[in-house]
Amino acid sequence: IKKQANPTIALLIKKGYIEVRITAKAETLEAAQELLNPWDAIIRERLGSRIGRDLTISMEETLGRTLLKEHSTISTAESCTSGLVGKLLTNVSGSSEYYMGGVISYSNDVKHRVLGVPQDMLDTYGAVSEQVAKAMAEGARIVGQTTYAVSTTGIAGPGGGTLEKPVGLVWFGVTGPHGTVAHKANLIGNREDIRQSAAELALYYVYTYITEKGK
């Protein structure tokens, strides 16, 4: 970055990710692209799997295209996001081809009765935990009869946080043909910031699970 002239490279801090922006100046689009290509290759080589996606296409569109390409389906189980993951998925026209539906399991009772999360698991670990996030995802996959499923459970605030489980803590579960995994995030911002960031992260974790075969 220190030695750059044309093209230029900028790192932009966004909610939940860092955007790498390459800008080239040339007389034609084709000439600009020729300047960009070598740097694009260098950045992709150095960052490897840490590269998320092309930001000119939304995460929900990227995930939708991936699901359509492999003829797969997805369902959701949401607690703290209370439907925002499903909303993002259905922002895409034609999403009914792959999104089968979701369960908003805001209460522990619904987590247990509808998604099949064991009551002793809820009592032992609490709703905001790795174990429950995984069980929620597995339950959603069974209910929706889908290829994949994703869950969210967290503390969006402003109240409800503790030293052990602070406001902003969110657990995600993703399940599919490669088993079940969980991801933990400590998000910042107000209640809506945390919920929106969690919904967007949920889609990202499904995308990486699919493209990296269960990670």
Please provide the spans of the model-predicted regions.
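Short alpha-helical segments enriched in small residues
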Residues: 31-215
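Short beta-strand-to-loop capping motifs
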Residues: 22-26
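Accessory alpha-helical/coil subdomains and C-terminal extensions
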Residues: 1-16, 21, 31-36
